[in-house]
Amino acid sequence: MAGGAREVLTLQLGHFAGFVGAHWWNQQDAALGRATDAKESPGELCPDVLYRTGRTLHGQDTCTPRLILMDLKGSLSSLKEEGGLYRDKQLDAAIAWQGKLTTHKEELCPKNPYLQDFLSTEGVLSSDGVWRVKSIPNGKGSPPLTTATTPKPLIPTEASIRVWSDFLRVHLHPRSICMIQKYNHDGEAGRLEAFGQGESVLKEPKYQEELEDRLHFYVEECDYLQGFQILCDLHDGFSGVGAKAAELLQDEYSGRGIITWGLLPGPYHRGEAQRNIYRLLNTAFGLVHLTAHSSLVCPLSLGGSLGLRPEPPVNFPYLHYDATLPFHCSAILATALDTVTVPYRLCSSPVSMVHLADMLSFCGKKVVTAGATIPFPLAPGQSLPDSLMQFGGATPWTPLSACGEPSGTRCFAQSVVLRGIDRACHTSQLTPGTPPPSSLHACTTGEEVLAQYLQQQQPRVMSSSHLLLTPYRVAPPYPHLFSSCSPQGMVLDGSPKGAVESIPVFGALCSSSSLHQTLEALARDLTKLDLRRWASFMDAGVEHDDVAELLQELQSLAQCYHAGDSLVD
């Protein structure tokens, strides 16, 4: 591990969290593979914050995510729970019993063709059980790019992807995957549907001890653990798993940052009554309990509402995506997540998770909203001031927390990241003697341009901003979502020439007054429920008094975001 890295341990809880996480780790892998590219700006993001180094039993160096993930039986497809890097057939064959053996062999899931192709380019598992890795620069990241004599790699299609492991291109450590065997991923029976079920999972000694052992394994090898980031499904029983996990982290690792990303999949329909009621209850219980035990909580969704009334999914001017496909939705959310988490992953002058949370969560405002412009609309020949001026007075990013349009709302504090803009475009290149069309055009650095723009948009608001040269790397299996973009993500008038390879992204975390209306609406929807009709949810471990307390907590939390409650009032 590189000296000085401020390590983060990621917990990934739930199946949609698995989709977002797969895209997230694929992006980290793509960035690692580009680390030796002379054209890349070196040293902006520190991979050791998220990754750990290790060595197999056969002495081969490995680089794997510092990750614990939990999912249900049947969710892994052909991915092995113990991973592939550390497998040893010689040890598997060492059986002490000398008597008669009966072998029960379970039929293997067919491997996704994309993963077969990926593994064949990464290396092979030889007959002696040793994983032979092909040569990779620095032992990290993706293999070298294909040449004219090598076959073109397969790209997974939407039709070929059933579960997140179908497109994960990163090797995991054997301590990463923890399966909840008592609940099923597929089918109508044995599902993890309710908050109370999720809470009870981590109350069982078996699963609690399993999680604690894995936490201790990763934490004890860290030099300076700054905290934990939790990617957690909010819509199902994993909201309860996440709440108990956050409580355990708060108790065991007091003083460390805990930032929770509450994930919700695409749009829903009125006709699915039970599923919608459960989603409402799970989201409400999850938000309140996660807020109690986290430093910061941010809902992430492409939906327009957290409540019972369906709203259309959000729109991106330069993206064409199918909101019913988790593969698409999770790719967009992972792009935003990789951008807004930049502050605590920087190599130089990082903002710790605790400091970031403290800045955004004053006066009890521990829930924040996220937004992103994907891609940031910079046309050939334009400068950053030109592009920012095109937004006018409108909020420049698309909302990603199901809190409605941000227009007319108030921001109390914000953390903003703009990445992937070439340094030559940071400032206006006006001909000497030409009067600047705006104050932004008179700025002498990109950082000054961004800071002044934010000050104009949100006067008297506590803002933290970061400007990075490093773009978001769009590498297979990222879906084809972009329209009218160059390979570097610049906005084009005509047809694009070649596939998009990277994009600039503008992302933000904001403590916003929009949460006042969102949380109050959530509480109103809950008061309309006849809980006698949803006895199955209550039977999973939730009492009527718990619902009454939930309503009080939601209303108190909503009041924190009343437009008049800020540092400047």
UniProtKB/Swiss-Prot annotation:
The keyword Membrane applies. This is Protein misato homolog 1. One of its GO terms (cellular component) is mitochondrial outer membrane. Involved in the regulation of mitochondrial distribution and morphology. Required for mitochondrial fusion and mitochondrial network formation. Its main location: mitochondrion. The modification Phosphoserine is found at S41, S495. GO terms for biological process: mitochondrion distribution; mitochondrion organization. The gene is MSTO1. It is found in: Mitochondrion outer membrane; Cytoplasm. InterPro entries: DML1/Misato, DML1/Misato_tubulin, Misato_II_tubulin-like, Tubulin/FtsZ_GTPase_sf. PANTHER family: MITOCHONDRIAL DISTRIBUTION REGULATOR MISATO (PTHR13391), PROTEIN MISATO HOMOLOG 1 (PTHR13391:SF0). The keyword Phosphoprotein applies.
